[in-house]
From Swiss-Prot:
Assembly information from the UniProt record: Homodimer.
InterPro entries, per database record: aa-tRNA-synt_IIb, aa-tRNA-synth_II, aa-tRNA-synth_II/BPL/LPL, Anticodon-bd, Anticodon-bd_dom_sf, Beta-grasp_dom_sf, TGS, TGS-like
Function: Catalyzes the attachment of threonine to tRNA(Thr) in a two-step reaction: L-threonine is first activated by ATP to form Thr-AMP and then transferred to the acceptor end of tRNA(Thr). Also edits incorrectly charged L-seryl-tRNA(Thr).
Organism: Laribacter hongkongensis (strain HLHK9)
GO CC annotation terms, alphabetical: cytoplasm
Subcellular location: Cytoplasm
Top-level taxon of origin: Bacteria
Lineage: Bacteria, Pseudomonadati, Pseudomonadota, Betaproteobacteria, Neisseriales
Xref: Pfam families: HGTP_anticodon, TGS, tRNA-synt_2b, tRNA_SAD
Protein name per the record: Threonine--tRNA ligase
Length: 633
C-alpha cells in the first residue's frame, strides 16, 4: 500500500501499486493530460512507471525545465522515426537533447537536402498527430545486440557491444520504430506539437575524425508556439549580430584557410583589442597584480612534470629541434610557477598575484572552430594567485568584486554562477577539499550571490567557480573562472617558508575574468551589434566637410580632437555629404561631425549621434566636454 508524498507536502495512499499517470489522474484530469513524466525520489521516470512502495513524487509537465528537456529528447526520437519511414535505408546512431533543441545523427548514402528536411518535418507532424503510444521495454544486452543487427542497425549494435556483459537495457518503441534509450520519454507522440528542423551538418561517428562522416539533423522543440516564435526571432537577431559578418563589414578582422583558427586583426580590430587589453591592464595594476611574460615554446620535460603531456597532448602543437621535443604552450600556469620558484618565498610575500596576457595555442578540431569565438591561437587575461590556505576565501571574495566591476564596465549586469565541487577521482586530503569548497561557498554567500551547485564537477585538483554572462538576446556565455589548485604547486615544486619556519606548498588560484580576449571581443561585437560604446569604438567619430571650401577647417577640427586623445577619421573626399554620412553610419561610429560654411564661419561643428540625436551647431569645446563626460560614465 504505497504512500506517495507530493511537492505540497500532502500524502496520497493507494491500495495497490500505481503508475505515475494514475497518481496524476487521481489529482485531476488536467494534470493527467499535461503529465510528461514523473520525478520519483529525485529520479526522472516515465508516466508508465509503477510505484509499489512509499516515495516522494513530482509530476513533470511542460512548465518544468525537466519537462522541456523530455519534450526535446522525445522529438529527437520522432525525427528518427520520420527519417526511417521516408528513408528506410538510413541507419540511426544517437539523438540527444541539447540547449534549445535536439539533434540526431544518421548514416545515409547521400546528403539530406533542404527539400528532405521539409518532407521529414511534415512526416513528423503526421506522426505526432496520430498520437502514437511511446512504450518502454527491457532486453538483456545480448538480445538487444541481436535485435538491432537483425533490423540492420549496425551503429546501435556497436553502441550496445561497448556496454558490459549482463546489463539489461531499456528500449522505446513508437509505431514501427524502436530505439535504445535510458529515457524517460513522453507517453505518446501527441505531446509533441511545437518543433522545427533547423539544418543539416556533418558529424563524425563517435566524434572521431578517423570514422565515417554522418549527417546530423538539428531541430528545436518548445512547449508553446509563442516560445518557438520568440526563439526563431532571437536567431534572426543573432544572425544580424553575427560577429563574423560584422567583422567583415566593420573591417575588424578576418580568418583564412592558410591559418585556420587564427585571427588576422585589421587596424580597427586591433584598436578595439588594445582598448580591451589596456583597460584590463589598468585594472590589474589597481588590484596589485604583477604582469609577466613567459615563453611560447617550452621543452616537453616541463609538460611531463606538470601532467599536461599525459592529459593534454592531443590538443598541443609540438615541434622538434636539436633532438629535443617542444610544445607550444596551451596554457600559462606551469610557466608562472617557474617564475614563482625563482628565489625563496616567505609567507609575507603571499598572496602573490601574477598576470599575463598569454598567447596560447590549442589544436582544436577544425569542425569546432567558429570565427573568433573558438580559435586555435588565443590570448587570455590569465592570472595565478599564490596564497596560503587561510587566504583562499579573502582572495576569492576580492576576485569576485573585481570580476563584477569589470563586467559592469563592459555593459554586462546579468551574471550566472556555478560552483563545482570535488569529483570522485581527485588529489589532496578531504580536509583540504572541505576547506576549499567552504571558502568558495562562503565568499559567494558573503556577496549575497546565488549560484548553481554542481556536485562532482570540479577538476581533479580543486573546486571551481564559473561565471557566465547573459547578453542582450538572453544567450549565456561562460567567460570567467576561479579554479583552486592543490596539485600543480606540488608537482612543480612551488614552496614558501611559513610563519613557523616550515616549507609549505602554496595554494594556486587560476583565474580569468574575460577568458579568451578573442572570444570576449566576439561577444562584445554581438552584444552591441557592432555599435561599440564610445570608450571601446575603434573610430569614435568622423569629421566630414561638405565642400572643398571647408577642408582646412575640417582638418583643424580633426587635429584638435586627436590632440585631446580621441580616435578620429577625417573624410575630405569629393563626395556628396549624404553619401559620406550614410557610409560612416554603416560603420556604426558613435558620432559624425559635419562642417559647412556656417560652421566654418561661426567656429562651430554640427554633430550627429549614432542614436539619431542631432546636437545641432555647437562650439567644438562644448562637444569635447560632452565626450569627456560620456567617457566618465
Amino acid at each position: 500500500m504505497p504512500a506517495i508524498r507530493l511537492p505540497d507536502g500532502s500524502v496520497r495512499q493507494f491500495e495497490n501499486p500505481v503508475s505515475v499517470h494514475d497518481v496524476a489522474a487521481s489529482i485531476g484530469a488536467g494534470l493527467a493530460r499535461a503529465a510528461l513524466a514523473g520525478r520519483v525520489d529525485g529520479a526522472l521516470v516515465d508516466t508508465s512507471f509503477v510505484i509499489d512502495h512509499d516515495v516522494d513524487l513530482a509530476i513533470v509537465t511542460d512548465k518544468d525545465a525537466d519537462g522541456l528537456g523530455i519534450l526535446r529528447h522525445s522529438t529527437a526520437h520522432l525525427l528518427a522515426c520520420a527519417v526511417k519511414e521516408l528513408f528506410p535505408e538510413a541507419q540511426v546512431t544517437i539523438g540527444p537533447e541539447i540547449e534549445n533543441g535536439f539533434y540526431y545523427d544518421f548514416s545515409y548514402k547521400r546528403p539530406f537536402t533542404p527539400e528532405d528536411l521539409v518532407a521529414i518535418e511534415k512526416k513528423m507532424a503526421e506522426l505526432a498527430k496520430k498520437d502514437i503510444p511511446v512504450e518502454r521495454y527491457e532486453l538483456p544486452r545480448d538480445e538487444a545486440i541481436a535485435y538491432f543487427k537483425s533490423i540492420g542497425e549496425a551503429y546501435k549494435a556497436e553502441i550496445i557491444e561497448s556496454i558490459p556483459q549482463g546489463e539489461v537495457l531499456s528500449l522505446y518503441r513508437e509505431g514501427n520504430f524502436t530505439d535504445l534509450c535510458r529515457g524517460p520519454h513522453v507517453p505518446s507522440t501527441g505531446k509533441l506539437k511545437v518543433f522545427k528542423l533547423m539544418k543539416v551538418a556533418g558529424a563524425y561517428w563517435r566524434g572521431d575524425s578517423k570514422n565515417e562522416m554522418l549527417q546530423r539533423i538539428y531541430g528545436t522543440a518548445w512547449a508553446k508556439k509563442e516560445d518557438l516564435e520568440a526563439y526563431l526571432h532571437m536567431l534572426e537577431e543573432a544572425e544580424k549580430r553575427d560577429h563574423r559578418k560584422l567583422g567583415r563589414q566593420l573591417d575588424l578582422f578576418h580568418i583564412q584557410d592558410e591559418a585556420p583558427g587564427m585571427v588576422f586583426w585589421h587596424p580597427k580590430g586591433w584598436t578595439l583589442w588594445q582598448q580591451v587589453e589596456q583597460y584590463m591592464r589598468r585594472v590589474l595594476i589597481a588590484n596589485d597584480y604583477q604582469e609577466v611574460r613567459t615563453p611560447q615554446i617550452v621543452d616537453r620535460s616541463l609538460w611531463e612534470k606538470s601532467g599536461h603531456w599525459a592529459m593534454y597532448q592531443d590538443l598541443m602543437f609540438t615541434t622538434e629541434s636539436e633532438k629535443r621535443d617542444y610544445a607550444v604552450k596551451p596554457m600559462n600556469c606551469p610557466c608562472h610557477i617557474q617564475i614563482f620558484n625563482q628565489g625563496l618565498k616567505s609567507y609575507r610575500d603571499l598572496p602573490l598575484r601574477m598576470a599575463e596576457f598569454g598567447s596560447c595555442h590549442r589544436n582544436e578540431p577544425s569542425g569546432s572552430l567558429h570565427g573568433i569565438m573558438r580559435v586555435r591561437n588565443f590570448v587570455q587575461d590569465d592570472a595565478h594567485i599564490f596564497c596560503t590556505e587561510a587566504q583562499m576565501q579573502p582572495e576569492t571574495a576580492a576576485f569576485i568584486d573585481l570580476l563584477q566591476a569589470v563586467y559592469q564596465d563592459f555593459g554586462f549586469d546579468n551574471i550566472l554562477i556555478k560552483l563545482s565541487t570535488r569529483p570522485e577521482k581527485r588529489v589532496g586530503a578531504d580536509e583540504l577539499w572541505d576547506q576549499a569548497e567552504a571558502a568558495l561557498a562562503a565568499a559567494l554567500a558573503a556577496k549575497g550571490l546565488a549560484y548553481e551547485l554542481q556536485p562532482g564537477e570540479g577538476a581533479f585538483y580543486g573546486p571551481k567557480i564559473e561565471f557566465s554572462l547573459k547578453d542582450c538576446l538572453g544567450r549565456v556565455w561562460q567567460c570567467g573562472t576561479l579554479q583552486l589548485d592543490f596539485n600543480l604547486p606540488v608537482r612543480l615544486g612551488a614552496e614558501y617558508v611559513s610563519e613557523d619556519n616550515a616549507k609549505k606548498h602554496p595554494v594556486m588560484l587560476h583565474r580569468a575574468i574575460l577568458g579568451s580576449l578573442e572570444r570576449f571581443i566576439g561577444i562584445l561585437i554581438e552584444h552591441h551589434a557592432g555599435a561599440m560604446p564610445l570608450w571601446l569604438a575603434p573610430v569614435q567619430m568622423a569629421v566630414l566637410n561638405i565642400t572643398e571650401a571647408q577642408a582646412e577647417y575640417a582638418t583643424e577640427v580633426a587635429e584638435t580632437l586627436k590632440k585631446q586623445g580621441f580616435r578620429v577619421d577625417l573624410d575630405l573626399r569629393n563626395e556628396k555629404i549624404s553619401y559620406k554620412i550614410r557610409e560612416h553610419s554603416l560603420q556604426k561610429l558613435p558620432y559624425q561631425i559635419i562642417v559647412g560654411d556656417k560652421e566654418k564661419a561661426g567656429a562651430l561643428v554640427a554633430v550627429r549621434a549614432r542614436t539619431g540625436e542631432d546636437l545641432g551647431q555647437i562650439p567644438l569645446s562644448q562637444f569635447i566636454e560632452r565626450l569627456k563626460s560620456e567617457l566618465l560614465h
